[in-house]
Amino acid sequence: GRSFALRLGQAVRFQLVSSVGDTPWQAGELVEAQGDDFVRLPPIATVLPAAEGAGRRDVVVQLTATMTEVGTLEMHCVSADDPARRWLLAFQLRGDATSPEPPSAAEHPRLPAALAEIERVFGGQSKQVDAREVRGLRARLERLLGPREGWDLPLLRALFDALMERAGRRRRSAEHERTWLNLAGYTLRPGLGAALDEWRIERLFGLFGQGIQYQQEGRNWSEWWTLWRRAAGGLPEAAQLEILEVLAGHLETLPDGKRARAPVHDAYDDMVRLAASLEQVPALHRIEVGKWLLERLQRPAEKMHTWWALGRVGARRPLYGSAHTVVPAEIAAGWLEAVLALDWKRIEPAAFAAAQIARLTGDRSLDLPDALRDSVVRRLAASRAPESWIALVRDGGRLGDADQRRSFGEALPPGLRLIDVA
């Protein structure tokens, strides 16, 4: 077999792939792992111990793989000089063992049946599945697993992993693509919170450059942008900047008046919500997004989602982003003045936008002047806004579940809360 140099006493990482193709690869055969037949697996990251006092050193090893009696795969590095010396490569499928995790989704008694439903629609074999059956996949999953609002994080990620393994077959029809995008985004939201989410996000973002297949379908565009909004919490800055650049290109070509709209523009609301959800991009870019939103809001017929987006972009506390990407207080104050000039009874979302922009954090670099926040408190009280909104501006504190749901755009998985970033 092939030999490798293994570094002991230092963190090492092994990238694994599996093949879903029909080629019978032989053990030890060198293969170019390219194309849709290869699927990236979770990497093995570990430190293989050296003998006491030996420090870091290289040893020549060969890889062995065996299937255990219970059907799991074990991999060892075996010393070429002394076969009795071997190191088990542990698959880090549960994250840090010191971090308590909910019970595995495999314990859900109906999960195998749910995975079979996903396989029927997106499986490798060519099955006669009509459009109605594809559309009904989510309903069938809910009949098996209960209402989707109750699906916990391990179950959601098990479903996402099954969908991701079959991502290459999402393009069979417009219905396939739309259904896959909807379910993949829902089961990965908010893009963080579970072991291996970083790896899942990395795999998912590999699809971004491909775009959608059925570009004449406005509903497919809507699901496409919603997918990335739902996953945005786990997307790194570089990925978010790439998404924002593509979004800007589409939004800049938005037609005025009665000019013909492209199908992508049918998903305008979803594009706006996604742009506001990209909290990892530098503040300079978020300022540009906010300015563009304010310009759009000068139009009498502008959608209400744009007010939600302005509040999210100007928020003093990001849902998952870093504090250094928050829009500077002096700029946010200017936005808030524009919001205060409105009739909140006529434009209900403006009140929540104001509460987010004026929220007290206790950080002088982020907080707006007291007089401006007092004005917001009075306006919120006069418009009979929820007490929780008034408290955010007057006293600060954490978002309640309902307000976090409103900020995120939908409910988070059961048991998961986004903690405010200091």
Model regions and ranges:
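Acidic low-complexity intrinsically disordered segments
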Residues: 1-195, 293-296, 418-422
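Acidic, glycine/GT-rich loop-and beta-edge segments that sit at the periphery of enzyme/chaperone cores
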Residues: 1-48, 234-240, 253-301, 305, ...
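A residue-identity detector for tryptophan
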Residues: 25, 87, 151, 180, ...
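Amphipathic alpha-helical elements of HEAT/ARM-like alpha-solenoid repeat scaffolds that form extended
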Residues: 75, 135-143, 176-190, 218-234, ...
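Charge-rich, solvent-exposed alpha-helical interaction surfaces
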Residues: 117, 121, 136-140, 144, ...
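Surface-exposed polar/charged interaction patches
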Residues: 121-128, 143-151, 162-173, 187-190, ...
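Long, leucine/valine-rich, helix-dominated scaffolding and oligomerization segments
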Residues: 134, 138, 152-225, 236-269, ...
